[in-house]
Amino acid sequence: MAIFKDCEVEIFSEEDGFRNAWYRAILEETPTNPTSESKKLRFSYMTKSLNKEGSSSPPTVEQRFIRPVPPENLYNGVVFEEGTMVDADYKHRWRTGVVINKMENDSYLVLFDCPPDIIQFETKHLRAHLDWTGSEWVQPEVRELSKSMFSPGTLVEVSCVIDKVEVSWVTAMIVKEIEESGEKKFIVKVCNKHLSCRVDEAKPNMTVDSCCVRPRPPLFFVEEYDLRDCVEVFHGSSWRQGVVKGVHIEKQYTVTLEATKDKLVVKHSDLRPFKVWEDGVWHNGPQQKPVKESPSNAIKQKPMCSSSGARPMTPKMATKHARISFNPEENVEELSVAETVAATGKLEKMGIAEESVSCVTPLKQTEANAEGNKLEPMRNQNCLRNDSTQQMLPEEENSKDGSTKRKREEKHNSASSVMDEIDGTCNGSESEISNTGKSICNNDDVDDQPLSTELPYYQSLSVVNSFAADAEETPAKSARTISPFAKKLPFWKSYETDELYKSLPQSPHFSPLFKAKEDIREWSAVGMMVTFYCLLKEVKDLQLDDSSSKLSSLSSSLAELEKHGFNVTDPLSRISKVLPLQDKRAKKAEERKCLEKKIECEEIERKRFEEEFADFERIIIEKKRQALVAKEKKEAADKRIGEMKTCAETIDQEIKDEELEFQTTVSTPW
């Protein structure tokens, strides 16, 4: 294949720092001696921007760096695969490289040697590399590529420091492994958010230490992240460590960056679990930070203070008491030795012997059922003062004196009269109730409940105080029930058979009622008993569509009742379990609404496409009709043309006959 003046050739040049690059050019003179490779020939680049402006003479190049343009037919049927040598159209030159990976959209990653680089090209910008031997074109063999963890073209993550305080991880691609001063390093190319390295989006390469490079974490499927989860969030162009602080609809989250404390609202796809690369293995990072209890995630129960029946309770001492255990034996040890000494010392000053006071022990009540006997631990009294205890002793004596009279009265009272009396009390129509009782019984739902379900059996909480006649007698032979009131109402004897009471028996102490007037204490206690079981029924009958405000109101009411000695652990526990379920259901419902809106939008789009499709079908039908008409006209025209051609041939024949007759006539002898 000869080259001559004004023909198109390819010039090998390294002026721009690129090796193995070929430029299109036009020869300005014909080689006089093809065998002399060192002779320089003048040429001009076909790309005008490469020609140096202001130069008086055109550039020259040795003849051995000139070759013909490869013919296009040599590229037919060439299939690019990993390891194929190719020429890439890059910055007005054909640069030689190796295909290392096939990408989507019919594009390829090409590795270049000098300078080291990896660039993504579409197929139309690539051609198979051919070597010119001087007489023919030869295609090199396919190279065998290495497949190590950090081989060229492998996606990795490189650590970078933000504002000198935060380490983030950027997705990059290994270009080449090098060694500097005996240390292994990598030349990497930072990728864009689409993980591509296109020519128009390419970023400069950088050299990093091997300790700053790690593989990309494997994909971990996470259905939904929870509060306080440690995650990595993709922000800007890097993965940064953070903590989930809020969960929103449509799988969006509020994340606080660990280093800067900035808050971001991101999508689920921009999060991933926090992982650590160590010793060539991925390890789980801290999954969750400790959760501080709050009203939204836990319903706190207020601790009860243990107290002996005859010792004063100061605020300082009250803070030392822990929550009463459900194990009665543990409650006996609630008071420390120091507090016991202090209490007995004060009793001696009051004239009471130390031996005559015994520690408060919890009472055990045995209740028989179908399965056997079960022990129900009782709570200790809440911080009763000496004066309160001494005031109750006369009341208890009075209650004994009046017990015979109450028994005679109960015989004449029917069960319906008792219910009417209690119903009137809860509605506040006939009896005066303390502020505490009113605040608890002021629920409209309580008034509407059947009284048969609202009058459970009441068992008062008792504290045993043993007073010996002298130091030699055995203490604690009899127990006294310390209550703020004497049980005079028939209610206390008539409601123990109620099924609702049997489901969760209660033994409240009602000690806060000592502060109320004596004539309303018992009515307040009855109201609180009715209210508790009404609230218990409400908790049991909770519906999915109940609002969170209703649950909060139930929790607050139960917490108030707990101050009076009610055991509210089970209902509060149930409410605490229902709250997150309602939140999740609300989120799902919101997601459902969003999906319905999207479906509606998609339906509108589909309808529009259907209309467009129908329009196109009408156009196609019309075009077919027009094509049929045109075909018929064409056939008619062809027919006419055929007839005319036949007529023309006839006329031509007649003309020839006339000419022959004319010649014959002219040439006839005289």
Curated annotation (Swiss-Prot):
It holds the Pfam family DUF724. It comes from Arabidopsis thaliana (Mouse-ear cress). The lineage of its organism: Eukaryota, Viridiplantae, Streptophyta, Embryophyta, Tracheophyta. InterPro entries: Agenet-like_dom, Agenet_dom_plant, DUF724. Residues 294-309, 379-392, 426-442 have a biased composition (Polar residues). Expressed in stems and flowers. Disruption phenotype: No visible phenotype under normal growth conditions. The keyword Transport applies. It is found in: Nucleus. Residues 484-669 form the DUF724 domain. The gene is DUF1. The keyword tRNA-binding does not apply. GO terms for cellular component: nucleus. May be involved in the polar growth of plant cells via transportation of RNAs. This is DUF724 domain-containing protein 1. PANTHER family: AGENET DOMAIN-CONTAINING PROTEIN-RELATED (PTHR31917), DUF724 DOMAIN-CONTAINING PROTEIN 1-RELATED (PTHR31917:SF50). Keywords: Growth regulation, Nucleus, Transport. Residues 283-315, 368-445 are annotated as: Disordered. It comes from the Eukaryota. Its main location: nucleus.
